[in-house]
Every structure is written in structure tokens, then in C-alpha cells.
Swiss-Prot record:
Similarity-based family: Belongs to the tetrahydrofolate dehydrogenase/cyclohydrolase family.
Signal peptide interval: none
Gene3D superfamilies: Leucine Dehydrogenase, chain A, domain 1, NAD(P)-binding Rossmann-like Domain
Name of the protein in question: Bifunctional protein FolD
Transmembrane segments: none
Pfam families for the chain: THF_DHG_CYH, THF_DHG_CYH_C
Organism this protein belongs to: Xylella fastidiosa (strain Temecula1 / ATCC 700964)
Length: 291
């Protein structure tokens, strides 16, 4: 247990992501030296949402750093679902494309999930396709959702065991919370998932007993830091911009850092790991075509 004067160690996602990207570059260089195609990633951006533009730029920069060739498909906001479906079909059929990334959200398209399902699961480097999530549920390793997989990598860089721990996940989105639960089950945790129907007193109790706390809600300070169990590992997936422009997470950082053993910063924690894991999935998708 931490003493009252101790502060959590910062789980530096930027540094860990950079180390992962360096390792991936070594593998890509070896692949190219062996006469194989470099991994390729089709990046589809619809419209000009500022956040999406930033996310896509970060992904393209990471691809360049690793040696993955990115093909850019920047489409107007008026692009229809039928036009996107036709593009996905072309990318699925192109043997030179190893990974397909559709940046979400898609403006004007209410059912993006239908388009995600259209991506060839072998090229679904986001890991969102139901077939890939199903593999995870069956404890089969394939193209796993990037953010949960990146969080597992982060947990491996602490000095805290994962197997046998109590883990609480706050938020049950299809892209983070639900697959995160599967990842932690596979890692040997006892998992509690909390959501909008979880009574407040039950939510607080679940947070207070968590050795590993993962929060992915998208509401600043939704989890008071005072709830954090002393010595817990806290992974804050949320990134929220306040009226003054400050970026904050879903957990009250100032008080949580005095109780946790490890905690991710916002920004600079989970986000870089998501991007690095996308590159990891893209390389693995390319390697799977060599068999």
C-alpha cells in the first residue's frame, strides 16, 4: 500500500509507444530486406472534422516512422454510404493493401458499423470487425481492437501483476470497454464492467475494490480520484477538452495520483499506444499474407 506522501508513477504512453514503433520498424526493415512488400495501410477520412484530421495525421506519421506505406483517401463530407462501400470493396480486393482504416465518426452516415462489417476481417487493422472481436472472445489471437490491446501493453510495463487481480472497467463501448473486458479475462483478471445503468453506489464500490481501473466514458472527472484503491493501476482512456482549452481525462487526476501506484497521463497515455498498436496490427496483417 502507498504511503500518504507517495505519488503514482506516470505510465508514459508516448515513451512506450515510441519503443514499440522502433521494434516494429526493425521488423519492417527485415521484411523489406527479405524482398517482401512493405506493409500497406489504406487510410480513409471523410470530411474535415478537426479531431479526426489530427488523429489521421498522427496515424500517417506513425506509419511513415515504421516504414508502412500509407495510401490516403480523403473524401468530401457528402460522400455516401454506397460510395464508401464501393471503396471498401476495391480495397478488400487489392492484394497490395494489407490494412484498411476507416476513421470514425463518419459524417452523415448513421450506421458506420455496417461499413466496418464490410471490411475484410484480415484487413481490419482497427480490430472492430465482429469476426475479430469474436476471435478475442474465444481466446484466439488475431487482429485485436487497438486501444484495449495497447492498454494490455501498458499494463505489462508496470511492476504490478495482472493475473489474479480485480479489474473494473467503467464504460462499455464496442471499441474500448467491451473488448477490454475480454482482454482482461484472457489475462486472468476478475472483471467488473460498469455502465450507465450501474447504480452510483455500486459504481463507487466497484472502483474502490479495483486493483486495475480502466475508465473510458468521455466525461471529465466522472470518477473522483478519492475512490481509487491505494496502490491501484489507473488507465484513463478519456480525453476531454474543458472550456479553458485544457485536456483532461475521466478520472480526477490530482487526487488519484496520490493513491494509485501507476497512472496514465492525459494526454500522452493511452492515445499514443492506440496509434502504435494500429501499426502493430498492420504489420501482422501483412505478415499473415506471407503464409
Amino acid at each position: 500500500m502507498l504511503a500518504a506522501t507517495d505519488l503514482a508513477r506516470i505510465l508514459d504512453g508516448r515513451r512506450i509507444a515510441d519503443d514499440l514503433l522502433d521494434a516494429l520498424k526493425t521488423r519492417v526493415d527485415a521484411r523489406v530486406a527479405a524482398g517482401k512488400l512493405p506493409p500497406t495501410l489504406a487510410v480513409v477520412l471523410v470530411g474535415s472534422d478537426p479531431a479526426s484530421v489530427v488523429y489521421v495525421r498522427n496515424k500517417r506519421r506513425a506509419a511513415e516512422k515504421v516504414g508502412i506505406k500509407a495510401y490516403d483517401f480523403d473524401l468530401p463530407e457528402a460522400t455516401t454510404e454506397a460510395e464508401l462501400a464501393a471503396l471498401i470493396d476495391r480495397l478488400n480486393a487489392d492484394p497490395k493493401i494489407h490494412g484498411v482504416l476507416i476513421q470514425l465518426p463518419l459524417p452523415g452516415i448513421p450506421d458506420a458499423h455496417r461499413l466496418i462489417q464490410r471490411i475484410d476481417p484480415r484487413k481490419d487493422v482497427d480490430g472492430f470487425h465482429p469476426q475479430n472481436v469474436g476471435h478475442l472472445a474465444l481466446r484466439e489471437f488475431g487482429l485485436r481492437p487497438c486501444t484495449p490491446r495497447g492498454i494490455v501493453t501498458l499494463l505489462g510495463h508496470t511492476d504490478r501483476p495482472v493475473r489474479g487481480r480485480n479489474a473494473t472497467i467503467v464504460g462499455v463501448s464496442n471499441h474500448v470497454g467491451r473488448p477490454m473486458g475480454l482482454e482482461l479475462l484472457m489475462a486472468g483478471c476478475t472483471v467488473t464492467s460498469c455502465h450507465k445503468f450501474t447504480p452510483p453506489q455500486m459504481l463507487e464500490a466497484a472502483v474502490r475494490q479495483a486493483d486495475i481501473l480502466i475508465v473510458a466514458v468521455g466525461r471529465p472527472g466522472v470518477i473522483p480520484g478519492e475512490w481509487v484503491k491505494p496502490g491501484a493501476v489507473v488507465i484513463d482512456v478519456g480525453i476531454n477538452r474543458l472550456d479553458d482549452g485544457q485536456l483532461v481525462g475521466d478520472v480526477g487526476f490530482e487526487s488519484a495520483v496520490k493513491r494509485a501506484s501507476w497512472i496514465t497521463p492525459v494526454p500522452g497515455g493511452v492515445g499514443p499506444m492506440t496509434v502504435a498498436t494500429l501499426m502493430q496490427n498492420t504489420l501482422e496483417a501483412a505478415e499473415a499474407t506471407d503464409c
